[in-house]
């Protein structure tokens, strides 16, 4: 695939995706689970490396019919969509965004999704009972985005961790054998926080998925109470997971040295897929500001959903610093509250200066975005800490998850220490203690790093990288990949005789 033309890549992926759909139709057992795997960053990425041309149909088009179509519309269109008699698409040709314009065209009413809003026969538009009802499909897709970027991050961390345990370099002790790169604390600092993040993001995405299902069931009964909170959380988590995963994937790539920049390492493709998620289904800056609006409203009105309860119920008792996971969770809450209050103060200050409301908002955007990001990080940390209370966890699993959780939540504090100094009463000695804990956790998790990434159960075909191969035979596989290049099919490429050789003999 790497050496096909752009047009040939598209045709080949379309051929394979259509063949897969035929195979799937012949094997109904486990069809739903297989379909989900084919549309995401797992099995689908192994077979369809350049993307699945009909993934959009299953991920967005069918959910939109289910969530926004009337009973009659679903009866007419859903079966056709499931059987691929109709296919939903953006009509993209991957060169640019297409568009469709109408001039005095009357769209049949039955082809307007009218579960929540309607157009009457006389042309009157009837608004939905809640303006955010039409967001249901986007909320669903944002949950899928969180899961997808997390899986891509798992792939990147697996590749980088395995390679770092194969690659040996320099001398840790003079005269000793070159150690595995993973034995250097600096490499652990690069790779173990992303490893821990895969668990935090997945647990938060699972939590959000459960909330989505609960809210969806409530909405079917006409209860919209959970919708604002769900919308705010889905915006926050999508923005956080995509942006953090992009940064972590790039760190993983850099941790593999020059080999990480090779096309066959699969890092360029993984990075491209994750960074794209920063923009689609809501550009992250726009989403952060939507979240901020919800937070400001909640703080001012003292009313909101479960995820923002901390903005309504003030912390009681002395604001001491406790470095246990539960204590650190309280620090995150203080920061989230503090940054919302700072943003509100900035808005009020702008209003006193005479700014119109929209200008006051624009001039407070930096503070508002920071508040929204703190809210998102709090949700991830809460999901991670709460998961450790699960009684079903075995003692060894609970132990390693606890270490990963503690590493991750301390990593974020050290990375954003200014916010914790400003809002959480953190002092220099607290930060030094957390830093000491952090490096201790790096050393404690290091011996289990390969076992942890192996537990992801990602086959070599899904990783698609010689650097992350399960058997560790990295360099032979790199040689084999290089041999596939059309440039390496001849000992001396004809361009040498045509261009370089005359230059060498020209006596410039």
Model regions and ranges:
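Flavin-dependent oxidoreductase catalytic core characteristic
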Residues: 1-508
């Amino acid at each position: 695939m790497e050496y096909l033309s752009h047009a040939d890549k598209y045709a080949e992926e379309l051929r394979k995706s259509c063949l897969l759909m035929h195979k799937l139709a012949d094997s109904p057992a486990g069809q739903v689970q297989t379909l989900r795997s084919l549309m995401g960053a797992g099995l689908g990425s192994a077979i369809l490396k350049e993307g699945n041309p009909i993934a959009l149909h299953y991920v967005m088009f069918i959910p939109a019919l289910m969530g926004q179509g009337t009973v009659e519309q679903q009866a007419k269109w859903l079966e056709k969509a499931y059987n691929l008699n109709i296919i939903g698409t953006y009509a993209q040709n991957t060169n640019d965004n297409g568009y469709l314009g109408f001039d005095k065209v009357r769209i049949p009413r039955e082809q307007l999704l009218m579960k929540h809003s309607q157009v009457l026969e006389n042309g009157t538009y009837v608004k939905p009972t809640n303006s955010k009802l039409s967001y249901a499909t986007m909320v669903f897709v944002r949950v899928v985005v969180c899961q997808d970027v997390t899986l891509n991050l798992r792939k990147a961390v697996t590749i980088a961790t395995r390679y770092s345990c194969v690659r040996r370099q320099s001398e840790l002790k003079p005269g000793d054998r070159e150690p595995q790169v993973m034995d250097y604390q600096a490499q652990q600092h690069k790779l173990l926080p992303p490893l821990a993040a895969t668990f935090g993001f997945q647990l938060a995405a699972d939590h959000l998925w459960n909330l989505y299902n609960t809210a969806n069931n409530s909405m079917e009964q006409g209860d919209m109470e959970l919708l604002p909170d769900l919308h705010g959380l889905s915006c926050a988590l999508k923005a956080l997971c995509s942006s953090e995963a992009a940064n972590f994937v790039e760190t993983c790539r850099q941790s593999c040295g020059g080999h990480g920049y090779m096309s066959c390492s699969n890092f360029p493709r993984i990075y491209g897929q994750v960074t794209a998620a920063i923009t689609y289904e809501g550009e992250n800056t726009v989403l952060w500001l939507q979240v901020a609006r919800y937070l400001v409203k909640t703080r001012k009105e003292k009313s909101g959903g479960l995820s923002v309860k901390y903005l309504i119920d003030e912390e009681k008792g002395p604001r001491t610093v406790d470095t246990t996971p539960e204590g650190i969770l309280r620090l995150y809450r203080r920061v989230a509250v503090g940054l919302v209050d700072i943003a509100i103060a900035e808005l009020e200050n702008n209003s006193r200066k005479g700014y119109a409301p929209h200008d006051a908002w624009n001039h407070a955007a930096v503070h508002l975005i920071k508040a929204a990001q703190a809210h998102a990080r709090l949700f991830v940390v809460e999901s991670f800490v709460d998961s450790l209370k699960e009684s079903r966890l075995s003692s060894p699993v609970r132990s390693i998850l606890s270490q990963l959780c503690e590493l991750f939540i301390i990593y974020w504090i050290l990375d954003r220490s200014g916010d914790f100094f400003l809002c959480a009463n953190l002092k220099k000695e607290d930060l030094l203690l957390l830093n000491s804990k952090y490096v201790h956790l790096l050393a404690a998790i290091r011996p289990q790093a390969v076992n942890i990434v192996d537990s992801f159960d990602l086959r070599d075909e899904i990783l698609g990288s010689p650097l992350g191969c399960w058997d560790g035979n990295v360099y032979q596989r790199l040689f084999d990949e290089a041999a596939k290049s059309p440039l390496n099919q001849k000992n001396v490429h004809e361009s040498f005789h045509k261009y370089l050789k005359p230059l060498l003999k020209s006596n410039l």
